[in-house]
């Protein structure tokens, strides 16, 4: 066994090219596969960026190096110092001839999961051994695209003058008056894990921040057991002052469009590896009102009445009709939280919107109520006690500007971008009703 000592990686696998013929490199990673054929051994080393072939001919390396190569096992951690040799017959037009191989750590055998993807495994097995599962190139591709998604979103917000904030995740009461909260013991009191940063975002509008965003965990104690829901999720939230719901939708369009464009430019290998049918959307998305969506659903045989939230069957019907990215706007006020602003011409309809991808809701937003009296009235009308929202409501007494915002589900958006049909594929260590480990 060797320590890393004075060695440091000089290149990732994808950085080595045939034009480096004769150059010495140091590579580090996992043994993806090993073949020993008499006086010749082939070692495929895998790192974060891909794989690279090292050829170990007995007549060209010292005896110790050849013996080390023959005894390597799958997923051993190794470092190779060697020379690049151009070879048109090699998989990438070159190979690496080791000068020295250091075994940094051995992997036990047999492996509980095959990172080479030759042996398929069910998702529960893969999640149980997630540290091995994420060694698979296709799984890494999902999370590289997710990482680029988040980088792009932060850049767009920064370019548009937004301030990044962090809001509490330990709260005293429900954000939206719901019961789907995880209670925890907080010294002598009961507290809850935050289900949304909504109230804090609005309080910051009273503070004069104008434009804020947050990317953070939210927690919802909903007993869903579907491919679209998790109990711990990452939400991308924003709030803007002196705007209406149309401005908020335009900002959401910009964020989503830039994600597609940036991923196309910066992650072409991952797009190819996942065999994605990649298409950057138009800069503005189609829009359909809630009433029009209901009409579409009914025309396709779905039983639903105006004023009901869209059922799964209705979402599928509308998604089949609309396809791709589109907004559903002008929702019934009764279906939305108390802080949603009713339409001035018809209070039964509010200035809310959902961004959909086919049948999947990925974002929800609205123009908010900014008048104190109306907010108190809405809270009471929904059967809640305004006193429970005292610190929130106080922000509306002393100069709250008109404002709007939205929340975008990072995990669901990653599902869309990577064409996965299970949200758990897009979360490193998902938390659902059954899963609390690893």
Swiss-Prot record:
First-level EC class: ligase
GO MF annotations in UniProt: aspartate-tRNA ligase activity; aspartate-tRNA(Asn) ligase activity; ATP binding; magnesium ion binding; RNA binding
Region of interest (Aspartate), ranges: 198-201
Chain sites annotated for binding L-aspartate: 176, 220, 364, 368
Keyword Kinase: no
Catalytic reactions of this protein: tRNA(Asx) + L-aspartate + ATP = L-aspartyl-tRNA(Asx) + AMP + diphosphate
Binding partners and assembly: Homodimer.
Protein name as it appears in the record: Aspartate--tRNA(Asp/Asn) ligase
Gene name as annotated: aspS
């Amino acid at each position: 066994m060797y320590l890393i000592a004075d060695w440091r990686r000089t290149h990732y696998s994808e950085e080595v090219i045939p034009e480096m013929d004769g150059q010495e490199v140091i590579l580090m990673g996992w043994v993806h596969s090993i073949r020993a054929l008499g006086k010749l051994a082939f070692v495929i080393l895998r790192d974060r960026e891909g794989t690279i072939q090292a050829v170990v001919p007995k007549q060209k390396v010292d005896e110790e190096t050849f013996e080390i190569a023959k005894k390597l096992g799958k997923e051993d951690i190794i470092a190779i110092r060697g020379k690049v040799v151009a070879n048109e017959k090699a998989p990438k037009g070159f190979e690496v001839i080791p000068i020295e191989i250091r075994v940094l750590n051995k992997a036990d055998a047999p492996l509980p999961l095959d990172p080479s993807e030759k042996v398929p495994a069910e998702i529960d097995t893969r999640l149980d051994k997630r540290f091995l599962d994420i060694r698979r190139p296709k799984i890494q591709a999902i999370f590289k695209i997710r990482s680029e998604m988040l980088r792009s979103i932060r850049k767009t917000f920064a370019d548009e003058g937004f301030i990044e904030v962090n809001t509490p995740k330990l709260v005293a009461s429900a954000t939206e008056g719901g019961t789907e909260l995880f209670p925890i013991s907080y010294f002598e009191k009961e507290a809850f894990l935050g289900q949304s940063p909504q109230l804090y975002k609005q309080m910051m509008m009273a503070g004069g921040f104008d434009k804020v965003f947050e990317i953070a965990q939210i927690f919802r104690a909903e007993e869903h057991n579907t491919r679209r829901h998790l109990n711990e999720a990452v939400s991308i939230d924003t709030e803007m002052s002196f705007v209406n719901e149309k401005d908020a939708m335009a900002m959401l369009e910009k964020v989503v469009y830039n994600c597609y464009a940036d991923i196309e430019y910066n992650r072409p290998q991952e797009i190819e590896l996942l065999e994605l049918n990649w298409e950057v959307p138009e800069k503005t998305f189609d829009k359909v009102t809630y009433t029009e969506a209901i009409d579409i659903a009914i025309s396709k045989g779905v039983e639903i009445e105006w004023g009901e939230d869209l059922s799964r069957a209705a979402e599928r019907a509308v998604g089949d009709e609309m396809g791709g990215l589109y907004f559903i706007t002008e929702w019934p006020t009764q279906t939305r939280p108390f802080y949603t602003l009713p339409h001035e011409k018809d209070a039964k309809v509010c200035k809310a919107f959902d961004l959909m991808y086919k049948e999947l809701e990925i974002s929800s937003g609205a123009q908010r109520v900014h008048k104190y009296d109306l907010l108190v009235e809405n809270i009471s009308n929904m059967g809640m006690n305004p006193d429970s929202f005292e610190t929130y409501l106080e922000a509306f007494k002393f100069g709250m500007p008109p404002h709007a915002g939205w929340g975008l589900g990072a995990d669901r958006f990653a599902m869309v971008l990577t064409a996965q049909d299970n949200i758990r594929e897009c979360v490193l260590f998902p938390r659902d009703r059954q899963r609390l480990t690893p």
